[in-house]
């Protein structure tokens, strides 16, 4: 194999390893609960990786991160399995 092919293969394997979560769940499930910048009080759910459960929190309505679900069922489907 040429060195170019080997470098391409190494790069693809590195990319695959970085994008594959170790736990089998999406990386967004590892993010902390973040209420965001606004002041609305929207009941929402986030996955808590320490307790391995979906928990309720109040979302402010803007900003925040992807670990934010409208329903506990959506949180379970995404992060619990």
Swiss-Prot record:
Gene3D superfamilies: Pancreatic trypsin inhibitor Kunitz domain. Keywords: Disulfide bond, Protease inhibitor, Secreted, Serine protease inhibitor, Signal, Toxin. CDD domains: Kunitz_textilinin-like (cd22594). Residues 1-24 form the signal peptide. Coiled coil: none annotated. It is found in: Secreted. Expressed by the venom gland. SUPFAM superfamilies: BPTI-like (SSF57362). Disulfide bonds join 29-79, 38-62, 54-75. Residues 29-79 form the BPTI/Kunitz inhibitor domain. InterPro entries: Kunitz_BPTI, Kunitz_BPTI_sf, Prtase_inh_Kunz-CS, TFPI/VKTCI-like. GO terms for cellular component: extracellular region. PANTHER family: KUNITZ-TYPE PROTEASE INHIBITOR-RELATED. Belongs to the venom Kunitz-type family. Snake venom serine protease inhibitor. This is Kunitz-type serine protease inhibitor spermatin. The lineage of its organism: Eukaryota, Metazoa, Chordata, Craniata, Vertebrata.
């Amino acid at each position: 194999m040429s060195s170019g092919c080997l470098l391409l293969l190494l790069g693809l394997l590195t990319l695959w390893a970085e994008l594959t979560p170790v736990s089998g769940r999406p990386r967004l499930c590892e993010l902390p609960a973040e209420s965001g910048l606004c002041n609305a009080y929207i009941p929402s759910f986030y996955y808590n990786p320490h307790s391995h459960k979906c928990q309720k929190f109040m979302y402010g309505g803007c900003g925040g991160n992807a670990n934010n679900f409208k329903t506990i069922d959506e949180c379970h489907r995404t992060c619990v399995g």
